[in-house]
Amino acid sequence: MAGHSKWANIQHRKGRQDEKRQRVWTRVMREIMVAARMGGGDLGTNPRLRLAVDKAKAANMPADNVKYGIAKATGSLEGVHYEEVRYEGYGFGGAAIIVDCMTDNRVRTVAEVRHAFSKHGGHMGTEGSVAFQFKHCGQLIFAPGTSEDKVMEVALEAGADDVITHDDGAIEVLTPYTDFEAVKKALEAAGLKPELAEVTMRADNMIELTGEDARKMQKLLDVLEDLDDTQEVFHNAALDASE
């Protein structure tokens, strides 16, 4: 099943994360703390915490930092309490954007998100204005050249919903968010290591943006991602700035 180009967007995202490791660590630490506060500090019974710890390992965060974050969240140490908030809006060409944040000050966060939208050509919407265009699911991305047949066989057997081969050769596995961990483990046990593995909000349909609109949209997304309280930015824009 063919789809739109995927690999360049993944590499852009990974490149920005590599450039800003400390910011990535901060975001992962917030996720660890919220996951541990909501579900407890036991990795064996808290799948959200397990996923957060996996992200910490992928970001090369020291194990002591992870333990410290769990301890703060579960009451062993004093710490800041974060809450999760979601903002929705629009970018260029009517593209939909979701900004998930963790904050200790909602007033500050909403002001920063609204300013980023308005200054860079987008605008904020109301709650629920764009979220219906996305599906909460597990997503695993494999590099071009990975065996499509092997990925498909293992993933579907383990409970994946779909396997998509994109035009650039990247392979995308979609799972129910509740089955993400089981599918990921099955693929890794078969020697198939994804370049990206996460529970995400995946757009049902993409909006193609080219040229100046694509460049402006990328700038808006980058600014939103760089806000201190941002955890994740999801959108439905397929960007091609080459024209």
Curated annotation (Swiss-Prot):
Entry keywords, A to Z: Cytoplasm, DNA-binding, Transcription, Transcription regulation
Gene Ontology biological-process annotations: regulation of DNA-templated transcription
One of the record's GO cellular component terms: cytosol
Region called Disordered, residue ranges: 1-22
Signal peptide residues on this chain, from the entry's feature table: none
Gene Ontology molecular function, alphabetical: DNA binding
PANTHER family: TRANSCRIPTIONAL REGULATORY PROTEIN YEBC-RELATED (PTHR12532:SF6), TRANSLATIONAL ACTIVATOR OF CYTOCHROME C OXIDASE 1 (PTHR12532)
Family classification: Belongs to the TACO1 family.
Protein name in the entry: Probable transcriptional regulatory protein Bpro_1967
